[in-house]
């Protein structure tokens, strides 16, 4: 309930840097243990900001595991979640045991058939109703998802499963 969140840390740092209460919205939520790269968010402030100065001040106030890459002006109607046309998830599967990356990858002991994985991933492209794959389909805005692409790539000992879709279902 009172757990530390990325959004909470970012909001607190921005409010300290700007001296005002701000509305902060992200382009999506992440489950516990899921890490976001290049997450887009919006912040509405009362005044004009000196972007470089605020960026430096905010990053100095954030813990080491959170970093803001840039601040960009956006129109009044921009909303990080509602304006986004797609989202991308990357699942990392390790083909060998790894001590340093174990929090970020799924280690599969058995050999994987990458060709079969690629063929299966390609079948996910298109418009599908995923209602059967979520716990509470009635709480979803829509269980119909447009999967732009699903690809399996190799990167050394890692397999990267990259899924780009209109949205993803909550549980």
Language model segments and positions:
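Structured-RNA-binding interfaces characteristic of tRNA pseudouridine synthases
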Residues: 1-171
